Curated annotation (Swiss-Prot):
Organism: Parafrankia sp. (strain EAN1pec)
Annotated TM spans: none
Cellular component annotations (GO), alphabetically ordered: cytosol
Biological process terms in GO annotation: cysteinyl-tRNA aminoacylation; mycothiol biosynthetic process
Gene: mshC
Manner of cofactor binding, per the entry note: Binds 1 zinc ion per subunit.
Keywords: ATP-binding, Ligase, Metal-binding, Nucleotide-binding, Zinc
Enzyme class per UniProt: ligase
Sequence motif 'ERGGDP' region, residues: 206-211
Protein name per UniProt: L-cysteine:1D-myo-inositol 2-amino-2-deoxy-alpha-D-glucopyranoside ligase
Cited HAMAP family: MshC
Sequence positions that bind L-cysteinyl-5'-AMP: 66-69, 81, 104-106, 246, 268-270, 302
Catalytic function, reaction form: 1D-myo-inositol 2-amino-2-deoxy-alpha-D-glucopyranoside + L-cysteine + ATP = 1D-myo-inositol 2-(L-cysteinylamino)-2-deoxy-alpha-D-glucopyranoside + AMP + diphosphate + H(+)
Homology family: Belongs to the class-I aminoacyl-tRNA synthetase family. MshC subfamily.
UniProt-listed InterPro entries: Cys-tRNA/MSH_ligase (IPR024909), Mycothiol_ligase_MshC (IPR017812), Rossmann-like_a/b/a_fold (IPR014729), tRNA-synt_1_cat_dom (IPR032678)
Length: 444
């Protein structure tokens, strides 16, 4: 049966879903101040490569980051992830690149359906509510938005097309009406996460796979198309009514908006396997082009009470909750920026007061009529961020400038620079995304 929503753009009365999409809206793009000079090429830890390397990028960089499954509010682990790709964008733009950025929303999936049933709410209403909250959180944190923010529901037609291609290429098979992808069809399977077979099986079972299902050719074979079940949303397709598997959703959306090969695939480190491994395998077999992504940039996990923040465990701190308690969004952003994106860390209650104190010092420093030369701090912030997104190092550089500016007071020294406060404010805004407010004209 087709999805029951009369407004669903991916659910016509009959036939395959169309590929003309009704675009989901992202959030506002904050203004980026223009800085003197230009940044340098980005070096970053590439999971598939196994080390930090300088990315070989053209004038236009194609970035894809996996988005939320909207059944709960944005927690700080989510915020830390999307802050990472915000920094990637800022560094690339400062280096003179154009960035084409796509992010999906998994707005139909088992956890969403289960939560909607538990709470007695229509799954579409739940998704809309949480997507709206996510947008508000991203806006408050000044996260640079994607050019295309794409829900799975609106992209079902694209996904059906890719699954059909995989069927035609002999890379798919049926198990009791469900379609599975054969990992044997992907020569490079395993080259993203570099796990051994035993590790793959464990990760597959922990992250949405079904390695123990009878009838599968390989326990690691991922689901492409889930046949219609009673009470679940479904869409028509050449292989029967149903809904997409998780991994192929991103493969199809990325191909439609960015092409067969993208430059950077992003997401939390828990997505490296099986999600990014399988998405790459689907895309490479369907497209006949390898690799799917030239680099994989993964963000470390954030813990609370000794465990990774997890919706299933419930040990979460939400952005919206911090905002409701009166936290300055810029302080929340600073609390996240003080951690390197590749290092797992623990959220504590002390994080916000420390970030608020830092924010106050920076705002006081840029409010002075003059300050130390801006050129060293601008160069250092650029260098730190271009070197594997070293946000803690960039913050330390601004700390040093602010301390020197405040120590000098109103700038009576002959070495003081009238332009420094405004330029440092713009540096922090453009590269770190932290709003320090306007710098008052001299003499006010």
């Amino acid at each position: 049966m087709p999805c029951s929503s009369p407004a669903c753009p991916a659910c016509p009365a009959a036939g395959p879903a169309p590929v003309t999409l009704t675009r989901m809206q992202a959030w506002p793009f904050p203004q980026l101040p223009k800085l003197p000079g230009q940044g340098r090429d980005l070096r970053v830890l590439d999971t598939a490569h196994g080390g930090v390397r300088t990315l070989d990028l053209g004038p236009t960089v194609r970035l894809y980051a996996c988005g939320i499954t909207p059944y709960d509010a944005t927690h700080l682990g989510h915020a830390f992830t999307y802050l990472t790709y915000d920094l990637v964008q800022r560094v690339l733009r400062d280096a003179g690149h154009e960035v084409r950025y796509v992010q999906n929303v998994t707005d139909v999936d088992d956890p969403l359906l289960e939560r909607a049933t538990r709470d007695g709410i229509d799954w579409r209403d739940l998704a809309r509510r949480e997507i709206d909250l996510f947008r508000a959180d991203m806006t408050a944190l000044r996260i640079l938005p994607p050019d295309h923010y794409v829900g799975v529901v609106e992209a079902v037609g694209l996904i059906v097309d890719m699954v059909s291609q995989l069927v035609e290429r002999g890379a798919a098979y049926s198990v009791d009406g469900d379609l599975y992808f054969s990992v044997a069809a992907a020569p490079d399977f395993g080259q993203v996460a570099h796990l051994d077979p035993a590790q793959m099986l464990v990760s597959c079972a922990e992250h949405g796979g079904d390695p123990g299902r009878p009838g599968k050719k390989d326990p690691l074979d991922p689901l492409l198309w889930r046949a219609e079940r009673p009470g679940e949303p479904s869409w028509p397709s050449p292989f029967g009514p149903g809904r997409p598997g998780w991994h192929v959703e991103c493969s199809a959306i990325a191909r439609h908006y960015l092409g067969a090969t993208i430059d950077i695939q992003g997401g939390g480190s828990d997505l490296a396997f099986p999600h990014h491994e399988c998405s790459a395998a689907h895309a490479e077999v369907a497209n006949g082009a390898r690799p799917f992504a030239r680099a994989y940039v993964h963000t470390a996990l954030v813990s609370l009470d000794g465990h990774k923040m997890s919706k299933s465990r419930g040990n979460l701190e939400f952005v919206s909750r911090l905002l409701a308690r009166g936290a300055d969004p810029a302080a929340i952003r600073l609390a996240l920026l003080q951690h390197h994106h590749t290092v797992e860390w623990e959220w504590t209650a002390a994080a916000m007061p420390a970030a608020a104190e830092r924010l106050d010092r920076w705002r006081a420093a840029v409010a002075l009529p003059s300050g130390p030369d801006f050129r060293p701090v601008l160069a250092e912030v650029r260098d730190r961020l271009a070197d594997d997104l070293d946000a803690p190092g960039a913050l330390a550089a601004v700390d040093a400038w602010a301390a020197a500016a405040l120590a000098a007071g109103s700038g009576g020294s002959g070495e003081a620079d009238d332009q420094a406060p405004a330029t440092v404010r713009d540096t922090v805004d453009s590269l770190l995304g932290v709003d320090l407010g306007p710098v008052l004209p001299r003499g006010t």
